[in-house]
Amino acid sequence: MKSRIKDCFNASEEEFSDWKWQYRNRITTVEELEKLILLSDTEKRDIKKALEVFPMAISPYYASLIDPDDPECPVRLQAVPQSAELQKSSWELEDPLCEDQDSPSEESCITHRYPDRVLFLISNRCGMYCRHCTRKRRVGNREHDYSEKAIREGIEYIRMHHEVRDVLLSGGDALLVSDERLDWLLGELFSIPHVEIVRLGTRAPVTLPQRITPELCEILGKYPSVWLNTHFNHPKEITPEAKKAMNMLACAGIPLGNQSVLLRRVNDCPVIIKNLCHELLKIKTRPYYLYQCDLSFGLEHFRTSVARGIEIIEMLRGHTSGLAVPTFVVDAPGGGGKIPVGPNYLISSSDTGVTLRNYEGVICVYPEPAEYSSKCQQKCTICDKHPGLKSDTGLARLYDEENDVIALEPEGLERKQRF
């Protein structure tokens, strides 16, 4: 397939290995696509309709991974539009995670949801437009590119909010900016005393591994605490080119993680996920999250049940090393944030002990200590410096002996207003 694509583009090996050539020559039309993979007349018509809603862009490299004769190829399903994208369920939203709601302004690049960290969108460009993208409202849309002014305002927001210790650069793709711009941005962020780490969210190692160059690795490696999370969804994506890219990053001292999305017909299988996680560990990449597919517009055909995700984790836990088991999370709609869900191994608990089961179904009892109080026993004042850790809200409030609270009630309970 690679040779076929090179011939189609009349490209040399040097050109094919150049990330800028790859980006310039992304496949964006049905006419270009049908030269590479088998398309029926119905598929051509459906793709053209889907492109009216969300554009297509496939790097020649990623296209080379597609089985041209298999409509069910897991790479193809992630890259090629389908008519199902035009079907909107009642639950689907343009901004299902309410990121815009947690931004300082409509034009801002910043989403500040969690207390000590922010999402900083720096690009709306990608090596490929994933069909399961949760930011379809922004990605590939020139109207939502980020100006120099917006980027500088984002930096200033972080500088003024001393609680922010962790910055996640994303987009689009955080690596789809120039080396010079990324170097400048990292320099600005690490000049802020309270910024401890910067994370990069990128799918470049998967869809555009040529982007990982010695020059880029030198830039990333010179800063004290840059982390990188990428997005492999299927073992077929872990190619020699991808392995080389990840190894270059690892050799530059960059800690690597992977965030997969659970996708129907792509990877909703415990064997596929297990193989993927094993292959990731072999390239020094920790399987970090397995996401339930978001409720973005036109993604109903990709979504699995949450129960299927839990089932997959159940089939991993104990059957492979803990390093190979990602955390399954639902990024809750309405801005609820990431909620971890998984199998329940705690059967019951009491003052004397807990009853547990293991992955084999073995049931055992673990005794609790005879005398123990959940009230902190430390004779220090460290918690006074972190008021957010005190248990005056949420479920923790019920267990705090200093709070005279036995139940938490939502505001506006109907039965409380009857009399």
Swiss-Prot record:
Regulation: induction: Transcription is induced at high salt concentrations. Forms part of an operon with ablB.
GO molecular function: 4 iron, 4 sulfur cluster binding; L-lysine 2,3-aminomutase activity; metal ion binding
Keyword Metal-binding attached: yes
Pfam family, one: Radical_SAM
Residues bearing PTM N6-(pyridoxal phosphate)lysine: K338
Binding site for [4Fe-4S] cluster: C126, C130, C133
Cofactor: [4Fe-4S] cluster; pyridoxal 5'-phosphate; Zn(2+)
Gene3D superfamilies per UniProt: 6.10.140.1170, 6.20.120.40, Aldolase class I
The enzyme's E.C. designation: 5.4.3.2
Annotated InterPro entries: Aldolase_TIM, LAM_C_dom, Lys_aminomutase/Glu_NH3_mut, Lysine_aminomutase, rSAM
Positions annotated to bind Zn(2+): C269, C376, C380, C383
PANTHER family found in the cross-reference section: L-LYSINE 2,3-AMINOMUTASE AQ_1632-RELATED (PTHR30538:SF0), LYSINE 2,3-AMINOMUTASE-RELATED (PTHR30538)
Protein name: L-lysine 2,3-aminomutase
Species in which this protein is naturally found: Methanosarcina mazei (strain ATCC BAA-159 / DSM 3647 / Goe1 / Go1 / JCM 11833 / OCM 88)
Lineage of source species: Archaea, Methanobacteriati, Methanobacteriota, Stenosarchaea group, Methanomicrobia
This protein's encoding gene: ablA
